[in-house]
Regions:
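A short secondary-structure junction signal
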Residues: 64-66, 88-90, 117-122, 140-144, ...
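Hydrophobic alpha-helical segments and helix pairs
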Residues: 76-129
């Protein structure tokens, strides 16, 4: 099943999820009538997430573009509910951040409690998939290309990756049965400048395959659940392919007015404009 999440003032929590009838129409979960998606305000596919476990350095080409070896075990970090925003909502560049970057990622949604599961059993705990954007303050993270000579950054990934609005999520959830081979999914991203000679033009950034993961989804679930029990509604954001802004020459970062677009074939996309803290971008 493929579902679409949207804002609905008629519900108790202001949130509704309907079955996608086609790319332009969703079935109203209350009365069953078809509703045009163009008339709806998207919400995150998961209205509320539990734990958000993110994986660093999990695509071979992403390691290659940094000149670092492939990790021998998954690299974990986390985001929280404060970071979650919907398609069309603004990414807020925090005060003091000058190197805002983004990454398209496949989000794996947990459907059954998982504690110390094996690789062989791991996929039985997956309910489905979403597209997410891992937004990063690269200067806070301490990524060398984002720093001026002599600067160090604070190296605090929790702050650099977990700031408010740093987890845009698309409105579409696709159940696991609809995607028998998630390793075949194509991940792409674009930056759309808000000003300058390329204003309004979608500039390709990333174009990769989930087959290029260092650790596949079963391996990630087994590794995480060995130490951290995964509950229904938890999310594993599985890493990103090459092409991110910080490792380009010269580096490319998001500026206020720019739009970040992330897309996964067979799932959908999430698109968000950047604004500075305290500044509304039209």
């Amino acid at each position: 099943m493929r579902t679409f999440a949207y804002r609905d003032a008629a519900t108790a929590d202001g949130f509704a999820v309907g079955e996608l009838l086609d790319d332009a129409t969703v079935r109203d979960p209350i009365d069953g009538r078809p509703r045009p998606i163009a008339e709806l305000t998207p919400a995150p596919a998961l209205a509320r997430t539990g734990k958000v476990i993110c994986i660093g350095l999990n695509y071979r080409d992403h390691c290659d573009e940094q000149g670092v070896p492939y990790p021998d075990r998954p690299m974990l970090f986390a985001k929280f509910g404060n970071a979650l925003i919907a398609d069309g909502e603004p990414i807020v560049r925090p005060e003091g951040c000058q190197a805002l970057d983004f990454e398209v990622e496949l989000g794996v949604v947990i459907g059954r409690r998982a504690t110390r599961v094996t690789v062989a059993d791991a996929m039985a705990h997956v309910s489905g998939y979403v597209v997410v954007n891992d937004v990063s303050a690269r200067d806070w993270q301490g990524a060398k290309p984002a720093l001026a000579p002599g600067e160090r950054g604070d190296g605090q990934w929790l702050r650099a990756k977990g700031s408010d609005t740093f987890l845009p999520m698309g409105p579409v959830f696709v159940s696991a049965g609809e995607i028998p081979d998630p390793g075949a999914l194509r991940l792409r991203s674009w930056r759309i400048p808000g000003s300058g000679p390329d204003a309004g033009r979608a500039i390709p950034m990333q174009d990769g395959s989930a087959a290029n993961m260092v650790f596949d989804i079963p391996a990630l679930i087994a590794f995480v659940s060995n130490a951290i029990t995964l509950e229904p509604g938890d999310l594993i954001s599985t890493g990103t392919p090459a092409g991110v802004g910080v490792f380009r020459d010269p580096p490319v970062f998001l500026e206020p007015g720019d739009v970040a677009r992330c897309e996964i074939g067979g799932i959908g996309q999430v698109e968000n404009r950047v604004m500075d803290a305290g500044t509304q971008v039209p």
